[in-house]
Every structure is written in C-alpha cells, then in structure tokens.
C-alpha cells in the first residue's frame, strides 16, 4: 500500500477529522511504531503500527456508514464516563468492522432524538458537515400551542443569537397523518395536544432550534431530526440502526438534499382536504368544552390570525 500523510490515515480510520487529527499529532497523542509522530509524517497504513492514546487505530480497509434513530436520553458522544448510554451502545456488533472506531457525524442534544449518522470515514463526514456543501437538516418539533402571526414574523426576520442571526430555511405545520406516522416511530409516547411543525436548517449551531423557539416564547417540548440531506427517517424506529445505502452515501458526500424554492418561511395550510383527512384520535388542547362538541377545528396554518399571502409551494 502506498504511503500517505498520517492525518489522512487517521481520518480514514475514523479517529477524527484531518484537522483534528493534526491537533492530536501536535499534542503528542499519536505514535507510529512506538515513536512520537510528527506533523506531515507519511506512513504505510498496511505496515505501520499507529496508536492514539496508546490504543491501535481501526482497520481503514472498510468504511462503514450507519444511520441511527437516536432516542432521547442517549448521549451522542462515543465515550462519556458520566453517561448511562451512548450511541455506540445501540449499534449491533455485526454492523461494526473489526476494531473500527465509529463516531457521529455532528451531534444531537441528549434531550433530542432522531437521525444520527455514524461512520469511520473522516473525509466524507467533513463534507457532510461543511457549510459549503449546504446539507440540510430537517426537524419535527412539538410546542404546546400553535404559533401566532407575530411569532412567525419574528422567525422570518431571524433571531439574534451569540453566533449571529439564526434563520430557518423552511417552516410549516405538519398534517395529522404526518404526525401519526412519526409518533409510531417514537419512544416514549408523545403527550396529547401538542402542535407539530417541520423546520429546516443549514446552520448547525448548538441547540439552535431550542434557542430560536425559546426566544419567541414557544419552547420546544419534543425535537426529532427527520432528515439529513436526502436521507429520511421513513420507518426507522427509535433505537434502531440500518446501514446507509450507496446512493445515500453519494448524495450526502456530494452535498445533496437541498430543497427547491426560496428561503422564506412558508405559510402552509393542511395538505389534505377536510373530507379525506383522517381525524385526530386525541382532542385538541384548545377545544371549547363549554358547549356540546365545541367549535370545529380550523384548518392548520402557521398564520392563523391575519389574512395570508398566496401560498408558496415547497420543493420537498
């Protein structure tokens, strides 16, 4: 096997990204054949004995790409002595190559759930995470009451955070059928009476959606990542893992999954006609019980309080 730069070998083995691998080398945490490694060193990965913190690196001959539906309460880091369960505890050993070090591509907060990719391909994961490739993340989020017109306008303008102005690519109310299908995949069960929305991001700031919705006084009760680029949650239940398909790997590594349309937050009404939509099993939190039956539930919309502009059709 041809010689390669050490940081590239470490990234391919899933130790860290190339830049982070350089930092490990500079810190003296990497040894090659028993000697401290140096920045820019070239090695033959088939012959050299490479160790990080005294442990041999994984076998880079096989790259692995796994999709996990992370449950709430599970830590996204692969090693945390304070955590009861990490994401690696959920991965069947049959899906992991011998000695491979898998690590998550990005993170999900411990309280959040949904899609998380695990891989040992450092170069590929850098492409997925780099803002230049514009890989979207789509989330389903639940709040206690529907968003008001003023709250939607505030989200459209963008919310000032420490990192800058946080913006959403798209926002729309979820249909009853979408909510029911999602709830079938989640554990623990979802409390009744929540209002569900879908939000799409390209920024990746820490706890961004929770901070943004908290700033408009709409704290998030449940947050589920349902899409990363072209990869969707579909029927993957909480705690389950599956390998990524080859087209999904190529689509993510090439910056796939961008939506058509502009960047304006959408004003989307119920997709299905009232006559064909399946009724919700649980009651609405705003149902008026002072008279029999209460008022009929209005069509779901992000802008319920004022006349809405012409509808913008989302490419997704």
Label the model's feature ranges.
Residues 1-316:
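Basic, flexible Lys/Arg- and Gly-enriched helix-loop patches that mediate nucleic-acid binding at interfaces
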């Amino acid at each position: 096997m041809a010689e390669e730069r050490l940081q590239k070998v470490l990234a391919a083995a899933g130790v860290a990204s190339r830049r982070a691998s350089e930092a490990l080398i500079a810190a003296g945490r990497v040894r090659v054949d028993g000697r401290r490694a140096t920045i820019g060193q070239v090695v033959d990965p088939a012959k050299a004995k490479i160790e990080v913190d005294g442990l041999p690196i994984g076998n880079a001959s096989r790259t692995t790409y796994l999709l996990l539906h992370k449950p709430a309460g599970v830590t996204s880091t692969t090693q945390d002595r304070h955590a009861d369960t990490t994401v690696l505890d959920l991965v069947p050993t049959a899906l992991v190559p011998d000695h491979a070090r898998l690590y998550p591509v990005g993170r999900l907060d411990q309280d959040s759930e949904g899609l998380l990719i695990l891989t040992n391909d450092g170069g590929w994961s850098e492409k997925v995470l780099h803002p230049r490739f514009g890989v979207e993340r789509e989330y389903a989020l639940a709040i206690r009451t529907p968003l008001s017109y003023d709250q939607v306008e505030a989200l459209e303008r963008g919310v000032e955070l420490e990192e800058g102005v946080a913006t959403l690519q798209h926002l729309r109310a979820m249909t009853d059928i979408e909510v029911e299908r999602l709830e079938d995949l989640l554990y623990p069960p979802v409390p009744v009476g929540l209002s569900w929305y879908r939000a799409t991001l390209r920024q990746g700031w820490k706890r961004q959606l929770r901070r943004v919705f908290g700033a408009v006084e709409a704290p998030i009760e449940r947050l589920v990542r349902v899409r990363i680029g072209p990869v969707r949650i579909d029927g993957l239940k909480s705690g389950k893992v599956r390998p990524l398909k080859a087209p999904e790997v190529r689509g993510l590594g090439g910056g796939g999954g961008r939506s058509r349309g502009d960047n304006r937050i959408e004003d989307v009404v119920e997709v299905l006609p009232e006559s064909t939509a399946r009724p919700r099993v649980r009651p609405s939190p705003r149902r008026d019980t002072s008279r029999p039956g209460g008022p009929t539930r209005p069509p779901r919309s992000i802008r319920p309080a004022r006349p809405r502009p012409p509808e913008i059709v989302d490419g997704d």
